[in-house]
Amino acid sequence: MKGFVGDIEKLTEDNDDFRRVLYTGHSLQLVLMAIPPGEEIGEEVHDDRDQFFRIEGGKGEVWIDGVCTTVKADDGIIVPQGARHNVVSTGSEPLRLYTIYGPPEHIDGTVHATSAEASAAHEHFDGKTTE
């Protein structure tokens, strides 16, 4: 199959991994995330890529350049390149979301079960796509 077709809402809601790369193209990448209550992705800046988040479940806060916004299911967020940002899970259930990087950020097929595992990994997109 070319491209990616799937029930992204169900896939996101069923995902228990902190990070799971679903599809990597030349210019964008689709990643599922489940952030446990009280945890966060960690403050970061992408100098060379934009990032889109779609919240499918849970509650949280998104910080973009020092501005905090409360988020919940059905919210969408765009973080422009160069913006310092963080996503924090503030509810009693995991914050479940998918994110789209443009261009890709992670190695295709990456799965990190926990945030600790993700923090320990230092690999970045190596140019290899899903197809």
Predicted regions and their residues:
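A short, N-terminal "cap"/entry segment at the start of jelly-roll beta-barrel domains
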Residues: M1-Q29, G42, H112-E131
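Short, charged/polar surface micro-motifs in flexible loops or helix N-caps
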Residues: H26-L28, P36-E40, K59-E61, C68, ...
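Short, conserved beta-strand element in jelly-roll/cupin
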Residues: A34-P36, V45-V62, I100
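Structural motif
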Residues: F52, K59-E61, C68, R84, ...
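Short acidic-glycine-tyrosine-enriched beta hairpin
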Residues: V67-Q81
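Ligand-binding loop in jelly-roll beta-barrel domains
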Residues: Q81-I107
